[in-house]
């Protein structure tokens, strides 16, 4: 079987230019020195780095932990406030009138720029409104808003008074919303009359009403932001529902709210993520360690400079939006672009228009978006300038080498380093990444660990793989890091069982990885996405990377399905680029490519031409659904309303039924 790294990387190393290195926030030499210190003397390293934040009171101990039993405390006894670190610290400096949030609406004619002082003023006022409705330190506030500035203002206002925010992505169904309300038991809900996505209205207030009707929890207060202005279809309950703008315009409302002094280990937010059991997990993050992780990674990974305009395309409903649209940028005094729309509206040049409109210097997006835009060709890109860009980033899933090369050549014009970042909702901040002026990149590799992070590969018996050279295993983290989650909200047992029980003494990420001869890490996909073919473990990401090497293929998703002889067979869903005709010749080409790049053991048993893939609105492929369809199970697919395009599922089922007949 050929070296499987051939699938994940073209054999080349891309080093930063001399100019980029000269001006970078860190050199390779300094990275190695600081990384060594962060592992060998974490107390000294993190005590020094924690001074990046403003503390009302210093901690009594940097770190205490019983890691194998999932018990970790950072900066215990230290007092700070997140909104103070994101806003107050800047308004007595020249940053007061610097753009903090640059908002671009779904409709290209709509935009707003809020300075640090603007955001500070709005956050203080809304914090006082929350207090007026009885929200106290430790209470939960559920936030179900579109990507508008009021979303950032709301979560910062929660942090100001010590309330725990739980943002639910605006694309989730009333049922999904209800399950989160039942779990976190919020004192108050903040929503909007509706929103816009791709030129189409989306229901928000109506979904909240439906969720509250079915919920066991009796939420007494719903604050509604006016976004669409369409009140005709709204159901309004006096004494429960209140307009945001009406409350904010109250002349008696105080313009200042004293920030609550929070212990470093006080809860900051709950963010729900999918669990293997189907019930969403409320990932709980705390104040000090999380903010330090977001702050420090943002500074080094994105090589941020005072004059930069930075754009993370993620929705705040996901952890990437929390850490790298709000908390990381604002605690560093950066200008952060916030985008309500989608990359394809009003046309496939929208991302590039926004970059040119605001002179974006740093652009952070997902491989799914990159591949979708690759499919549209170069016409939209050639009409744009894009010369303001100096750094590109990728997040959410491994980026296949073809997409990496396209991104580097066509968007970065061959001059912008790409930081391919690996991390999770649970980790809070970036864990494995290139530092752009220090670490040479390899297309498809997340590269090396960030400070304080000890990634290890563990075999199925729980033994750490220490061999030099190229090895594969289960990706685990050895030892605590500041921004790690502290628990599953309301379910401490589940926290230990999910992350610490499988490999004793390690945090198990759920991902498989390969470490090459240079120590670079290559994420090979979820371990539950590994297909066991005749006793051979085949990573779905490896087969997918081989399939998308073909110039006709836009995207591929590979899952296992029951096979009478092999135990599991390989089922490949393949989406082709526009204008490409699907036929047996192309099918044979794809099978041949997989055989050539991995081996005959990895050849797909089925190639299913797919009009699209079922994805969440954040771009995550729902492999659970694909596995069921591949196995001929068309019932019990779960709530598909959260998908970006639910109709894709029905089309895939119809195609599969034709195969059977």
Curated annotation (Swiss-Prot):
GO terms for cellular component: cytosol. The modification N6-acetyllysine is found at residue 620. The keyword Acetylation applies. Mg(2+) binds at residues 548, 553. GO terms for biological process: acetyl-CoA biosynthetic process from acetate. Keywords: Acetylation, ATP-binding, Ligase, Magnesium, Metal-binding, Nucleotide-binding. It is an enzyme of class 6 (ligase). One of its GO terms (molecular function) is metal ion binding. ATP binds at residues 396-398, 420-425, 511, 526, 537. CoA binds at residues 197-200, 320, 534. Acetylated. Deacetylation by the SIR2-homolog deacetylase activates the enzyme. InterPro entries: Ac_CoA_lig (IPR011904), ACAS_N (IPR032387), AMP-bd_C (IPR025110), AMP-bd_C_sf (IPR045851), AMP-binding_CS (IPR020845), AMP-dep_synth/lig_dom (IPR000873), ANL_N_sf (IPR042099). Catalyzes the conversion of acetate into acetyl-CoA (AcCoA), an essential intermediate at the junction of anabolic and catabolic pathways. AcsA undergoes a two-step reaction. In the first half reaction, AcsA combines acetate with ATP to form acetyl-adenylate (AcAMP) intermediate. In the second half reaction, it can then transfer the acetyl group from AcAMP to the sulfhydryl group of CoA, forming the product AcCoA. This is Acetyl-coenzyme A synthetase. It comes from Leptospira interrogans serogroup Icterohaemorrhagiae serovar copenhageni (strain Fiocruz L1-130). The gene is acsA.
């Amino acid at each position: 079987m050929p070296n499987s790294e051939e699938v994940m990387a073209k054999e080349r190393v891309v080093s930063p230019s001399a100019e980029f290195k000269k001006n970078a926030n860190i050199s390779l030499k300094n990275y190695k020195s600081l990384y060594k210190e962060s592992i060998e003397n974490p107390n000294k390293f993190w005590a020094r780095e924690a001074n990046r934040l403003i503390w009302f009171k210093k901690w009594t101990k940097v770190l205490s932990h019983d890691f194998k039993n999932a018990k970790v405390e950072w900066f215990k006894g230290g007092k700070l406030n997140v909104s103070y670190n994101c806003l107050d610290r800047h308004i007595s400096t020249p940053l007061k009138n610097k753009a903090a949030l640059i908002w671009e609406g779904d409709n290209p004619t709509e935009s707003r720029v809020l300075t640090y002082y603007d955001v500070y003023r709005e956050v203080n006022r809304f914090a006082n409104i929350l207090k007026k409705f009885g929200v106290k330190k430790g209470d939960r506030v559920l936030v179900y808003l579109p990507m508008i500035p009021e979303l950032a203002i709301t979560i910062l206002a929660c942090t100001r008074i010590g309330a725990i925010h739980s943002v639910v992505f605006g694309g989730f169904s009333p049922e999904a919303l209800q399950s989160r309300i039942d779990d976190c038991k919020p004192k108050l809900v903040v929503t909007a009359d509706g929103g816009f996505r791709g030129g189409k209205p989306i229901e928000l207030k109506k979904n909240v009403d439906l969720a509250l009707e079915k919920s066991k929890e009796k939420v007494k207060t719903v604050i509604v932001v006016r976004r669409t202005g369409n009140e005709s279809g709204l159901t309004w309950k006096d004494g429960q529902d209140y307009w945001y703008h009406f409350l904010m315009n109250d002349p008696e409302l105080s313009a200042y709210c004293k920030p609550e002094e929070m212990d470093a280990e006080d809860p900051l937010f709950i963010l729900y993520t999918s669990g293997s059991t189907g019930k969403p997990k409320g990932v709980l993050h705390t104040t000090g360690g999380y903010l330090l992780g977001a702050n420090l990674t943002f500074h080094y990974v994105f090589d941020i400079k005072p004059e930069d305009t930075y754009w993370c395309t993620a929705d705040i409903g996901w952890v990437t939006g929390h850490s790298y649209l709000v908390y990381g940028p604002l605690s560093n005094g950066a200008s952060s672009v916030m985008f309500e729309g989608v990359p394809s509206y009003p046309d496939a040049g929208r991302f590039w228009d926004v970059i040119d409109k605001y002179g974006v210097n740093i652009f952070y997006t997902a491989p799914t978006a990159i591949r979708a835009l690759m499919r549209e060709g170069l016409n939209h890109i050639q009409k744009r300038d894009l010369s303001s860009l100096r750094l590109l980033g990728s997040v959410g899933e491994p980026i296949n080498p073809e997409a990496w090369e396209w991104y580097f050549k066509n968007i970065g014009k061959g001059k912008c380093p790409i930081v391919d970042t690996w991390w999770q909702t649970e980790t809070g901040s970036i864990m494995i990444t290139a530092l752009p002026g220090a670490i040479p990149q390899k297309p498809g590799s997340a590269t090396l660990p960030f400070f304080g992070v000890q990634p290890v590969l563990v075999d199925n018996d729980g033994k750490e793989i220490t061999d030099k050279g190229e090895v594969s295993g289960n990706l685990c983290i050895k030892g605590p890091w500041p921004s790690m989650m502290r628990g599953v909200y309301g379910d401490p047992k589940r926290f230990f069982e999910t992350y610490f029980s499988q490999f004793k003494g390690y945090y198990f990420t759920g991902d498989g990885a390969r470490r090459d001869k240079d120590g670079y890490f290559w994420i090979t996909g979820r371990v539950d996405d590994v297909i066991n073919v005749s006793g051979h473990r085949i990573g779905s990401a490896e087969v997918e990377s081989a399939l998308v090497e073909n110039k006709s293929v836009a995207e591929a998703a590979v899952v296992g399905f029951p096979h009478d002889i092999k135990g599991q067979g390989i089922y490949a869903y393949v989406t082709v680029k526009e204008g490409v005709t699907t036929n047996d010749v192309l099918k044979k080409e794809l099978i041949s490519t997989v055989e050539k790049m991995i081996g005959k053991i990895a050849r797909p048993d089925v190639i299913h031409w797919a009009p699209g893939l079922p994805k969440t609105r954040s771009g995550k492929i729902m492999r659970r659904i694909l596995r069921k369809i591949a196995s001929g199970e068309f019932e019990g697919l779960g709530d598909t309303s959260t998908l970006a395009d639910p109709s894709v599922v029905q089309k895939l089922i119809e195609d599969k039924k034709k195969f059977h007949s």
